Amino acid sequence: MRLAPLPIPTRVYRGENVDSYSRRHAARNHCAPSDVDRALREHGILITKARLHPVRLQAWRALGRLRATAFTTPERILDEEVTERALCRHCTRGERARGRLPELGMVCLRHRRWLGSPQVDLHGYHPALVAERQFRHHLAARNVLHDSLPMLIGRDCANPAIIGHNEIAHRRDRTSINDPWALTYPEQVKIARLLTRPTFLGIVTDPDVDETQRHTLATREVEKIIPARDDAHPWRATNRVWTATTHLTARRRDARIHGTPIRDTYYNILRLI
């Protein structure tokens, strides 16, 4: 049975998932997604209530007259979940939409918007835009997601209490941005890049390299990103990075004994060496 599209068309946004689109498309046509799904089951088109069943995805593509690429963003990349999140409200013209965008960090460069909650304007904060370009070029290009372990460690290190409240206050006064995570995004991305840099990883996680030498390297590289100034506490960031690299070193050591290391979130960092 060939499905005819619903009368009123609805644009699908890049990365948008089927739940988000079906809600908007059904509402625009004065019904609910559940009503449409029920009708599809009554006509024998759907045989399951599974939201992500291929037949349901294809049905909603037909109902919206969408391309075959709609709803095909992978759910997982290298065993890591691609998290669904709110899309840029400027990209969606104010509509609420959700989806997966593995190639994006936390900034919509087109509209210069912070994609956290709430979304805020970043026109006055150029370092965050630079950080997003670096994320896409150096991290996303190697399948490092916006909420992957390197970025989570980066966020821990970019804590306002570590960077220093004086520096954060200066950025807030200069940009009128109140979200601390938007203000510290540049440091977050830099730490994540450090933790995925092959030359750094190769040395700091090498069991054969003296521990003092490895710790000195970690300290020096972290303090390039978060300098010891005013009320900053870069040693706390160093401790976080050192803890992570210690786990990685242990996995490399175990791999020499047992073969392939444990496949976990730390393993996904080791693959970058």
Spans of features found by a protein language model:
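Basic, alpha-helical nucleic-acid-binding regions used in initiation and control of genome expression
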Residues: M1-I273
